[in-house]
A protein has these predicted regions:
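ABC-family P-loop ATPase nucleotide-binding domain
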Residues: 173-193
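Acidic, glycine-centered active-site loop in nucleotide-sugar glycosyltransferases
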Residues: 90-92
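Short acidic-hydrophobic catalytic motif
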Residues: 84-88
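Short, charged/small-residue-rich alpha-helical element at the C-terminal edge
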Residues: 94-173
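Generic structural signal for secondary-structure transition and capping sites
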Residues: 9, 19, 50, 95, ...
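Histidine- and/or cysteine-centered catalytic micro-motif in compact active-site loops
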Residues: 57-59, 83, 100-102
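ABC transporter nucleotide-binding domains
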Residues: 1-54, 59-73, 79
Length: 193
């Protein structure tokens, strides 16, 4: 099977514990169990100081494994850098909020502290989940104040864009590729040691 072929190729690549590992679509053909095992192997390699170059269309796997990315489409560099910084740069100022009981956000919306509050579908025993949008860089504390005045806050986290969402936005031209400065002479070589 393709998964077994992939395993043999990966084992042959990693048996000598290389300092630099290049993996092209390593999750292709793997079931979830073998995909999880490969994640563990990659984590061990990283812990031992290996540099791993990963080429993949599996954006959730890339998000799980990589700390730094280069997003390339048709041979053109669209975006590169630390994944956490990239997600922060393209955030939508949205928050996922869970409460013990329903919350009325209408006063906060009317006051301009919140743009929208969408109640997400839920099962009977689950907390109430909302997707909250706030204006630009405004303070998210207003969300917490609104909730705590009416209910118990179960969870609160910022919803950052998924890497697959960013890829689609860039590939469709909704975002402009990052500008790459011309390298000076000192930057034109790559040192491998």
């Amino acid at each position: 099977s393709k998964g077994n072929q992939q395993k043999v190729q990966i084992i042959a690549t990693l048996v000598h514990e290389p300092d630099l590992v290049m993996l092209d679509e390593p999750f292709s053909g793997f079931d979830p169990i073998n995909g999880a095992l490969l994640n563990q192997v990659i984590e061990r390699l990283k812990e031992h100081g290996a540099t791993i170059v990963l080429s993949s269309h599996n954006m959730p796997a890339v998000e799980e494994i990589c700390s730094s990315i280069a997003l390339i489409n048709h041979g053109r560099l669209l975006l590169s850098g630390p994944l956490r910084e990239i997600k922060q740069r393209f955030r939508h100022h949205q928050y996922e909020v869970q409460t013990a009981s329903p919350v009325d956000f209408s006063a906060a919306i009317a006051g301009g502290a919140i743009i929208s509050a969408e109640l997400m579908p839920r099962n009977n025993r689950e907390p109430y989940s909302y997707l909250i949008q706030i204006p630009g860089e405004s303070n998210s504390n207003r969300i917490v104040e609104t909730v705590c005045g009416q209910s118990t806050l179960v969870s609160f986290k910022e919803k950052l864009p998924a890497l697959s969402e960013l890829f689609i936005r860039f590939a469709n031209g909704e975002e402009q590729p990052m500008s790459i400065p011309e390298p000076d002479e000192a930057e034109t070589f790559i040192k491998l040691n």
